[in-house]
């Protein structure tokens, strides 16, 4: 059984990687299209240049960034990026399925809270729950 070839809106990864940013903007969802048409910010351009430099030199090092608003582009596939979530850096390996999303979508800023059982040391409202 062969694995299915990745396609993004009808284009293969190789076709996407050969497109310019303007051509790519027409394929992307509206939110990212707007970001690309207006031009990437200076910080996002610096991050993209760093990713390109690391790929050209063959460096397989994790790139740390606070840029959660950076759209994931086809040329970023295969890179390892650590995105800051407000407390720590969350390491992400970019795969083709992530194209068309933002880096911040893969670094959650809040955790699911698991509350303890009521009783000793709990909140004031559960102070009077009988202990076993």
Curated annotation (Swiss-Prot):
One of its GO terms (molecular function) is structural constituent of ribosome. GO terms for biological process: ribosomal small subunit assembly; translation. It comes from the Archaea. Coiled coil: none annotated. Keywords: Ribonucleoprotein, Ribosomal protein, RNA-binding, rRNA-binding. Gene3D superfamilies: 30s Ribosomal Protein S19, Chain A. PROSITE patterns: RIBOSOMAL_S19. InterPro entries: Ribosomal_uS19, Ribosomal_uS19_CS, Ribosomal_uS19_euk/arc, Ribosomal_uS19_SF. GO terms for cellular component: cytosolic small ribosomal subunit. Protein S19 forms a complex with S13 that binds strongly to the 16S ribosomal RNA. Belongs to the universal ribosomal protein uS19 family. This is Small ribosomal subunit protein uS19. It comes from Korarchaeum cryptofilum (strain OPF8). The gene is rps19.
